[in-house]
Amino acid sequence: LNKFADVAEDGTYTSSIESKNRRFFTMLATLVRGRLGVGASAAGATRAGLAIAVKYANIRRQFEAGEVGEESRLIDYRVHRRRLLIPLAKSYALAMFQNKLLDRFQEQTDAIMAGDWDPANPTREQDRAGREMESLAAIFKATAATHANATLQECREACGGAGYMSENLLTTFRAYVDIFTTFEGDDTILRQLVGKNLLTAYGWEVSEMSPFGMAKFVVSNIGDILTRRSGIAASVQSLSD
């Protein structure tokens, strides 16, 4: 707990990180591992629930199809496919995002363990990479938790009464992931954190532009700004519709 700061017996607070802002973000960096773990747990429960619901939809039959005596499977209905396969596609995307994040986090951890990265006094590139990692971990956790709660509820409903039976685990998974919306950070606050960090990164990018680069930036963006504020885009869209 006193890796970056300490409190003496007389109550004096000292820290090896002089900047309050950097000290704050350095302490926040310790939450990255937990948020990755919570997000990964939520994503894993979601994939397990989808596997159960999709398999059930391929087996469960109801109502006769075109041929007499043959009943349609649940998965044959378009509305049933949409309610399961769209979340399944998003789960694949989150899994790939998770793997990329874990690789990046491992690289940063290896650099710290090797002594090439001092969390208390990082280089400018390391400081920005650390903040980016914090933002990515935050949005991954928030997105995975929200997706888990919505998808597991959908899986439960897609399986009908069978989905409510504890032996089929869907209600267990649903109860398991509910806490993840606030565990390791409230999802709403985490999204606000990501928005703040994006604005900060945007400010860095603009402040480092050369005069020529700034002029080019203004010219390339002024058209879009004027279009949005004048309502031209809405008028053109109305004519197109």
Residue ranges and their predicted role:
Residues 1-241:
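Flavin-dependent oxidoreductase catalytic core characteristic
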